[in-house]
Amino acid sequence: MFPSLQSFAKKVLARHHVSIDYHYILKHCGLWWYKAPISLDCKHMLIKLPSFADGLDLNTALMLATKENNYQLIKLFTEWGADINYGLICANTPPVREFCWELGAKYQVDKNKVMHMFFKLIHHGTTSSNIILCLKLFNNNPFPTYVIIREIKSSIYWKLRRLVEDTDILSNMSDDDMLTIYCFILALQDNLREAISYFYQHFKHLNTWWLICALCFNKLFDLHDLYEKEKIRMDMDEMMCIACTKDNNFLTIYYCFLLGANINQAMLACVQFYNMDNLFFCIDLGADAFEEAKALADQRNYFLMYHRLSIDIYSPDSSLLTLKEADPKKIYHLLKNYKSKNMMVYFDYDGHDTV
């Protein structure tokens, strides 16, 4: 689109720092967004706003303006060089779609552009700002969310399938919720605190999922905050089973143990998920359901696990039985360099047996 003289003048103004005394001029000119002046970094073509620490490239800014039905900014960003076809992705009402078409958008949303924008924002190593922005753009935005979910559904499904036994929960989950949980897992794994807080505040209907993810990804302090401060509750043994899904989840397993979860059920869950380190840790904590565990290992043809469970050499680790309350700082201090006593006993026995 060929820029108007007015948009060119606004572009010049946005490139320069304007004293707070003249902010009223920027508001009058339409260079005001998210309670702050719109600044333009022409070298990188980024919209600068305090609400978006990483800045917004023009196409992303256009999508956000379209999602908000901000006709003035849709036209301005398009005249500054944004691709109006990106705006069409977030056009949720007929009038906004028609406006995008008037500005030159194609009549169908480009699915490749949807995926390009999604993966540009959502990837390992991304930022809190990008994750929050992704949610603003795609939540309650049916068609592009549908496109994204169809593209990455298999990946999302198997990430979540390991966390819950009830497949009906996943089958009945909306595309919006599935996408939100996927983004939360990424934020949790990369410890993006601002994004994590945003999820807690804005998606309270998914609170149980936040608890599930904290258990599964061994996020002890998040688990404690959710359980004690947010008062999110689940069946204790179910929590323990989720903690056992990923190996080396000593922190969240121990937290559930101190809350009163059944350590023998945890032992069986470790066999079910074939998590050897977790299995030895449960034995360290006093699990003694060896016959049931052997039967399960035999049933699943886990020969190595069956062999290890068949040896009568194990006993609880008394150093783990000193804590009586689920204090995350004390748990972390106790386990930060922990090596399983019973695993070392086994390897010592196995070494001598081999000799």
Curated annotation (Swiss-Prot):
InterPro entries: Ankyrin_rpt, Ankyrin_rpt-contain_sf, ASFV_MGF360. ANK repeats lie at residues 57-89. It comes from the Viruses. SUPFAM superfamilies: Ankyrin repeat. Signal peptide: none annotated. One of its GO terms (biological process) is taxis. Keywords: ANK repeat. Belongs to the asfivirus MGF 360 family. Plays a role in virus cell tropism, and may be required for efficient virus replication in macrophages. This is Protein MGF 360-10L. It comes from African swine fever virus (isolate Tick/Malawi/Lil 20-1/1983). The lineage of its organism: Viruses, Varidnaviria, Bamfordvirae, Nucleocytoviricota, Pokkesviricetes.
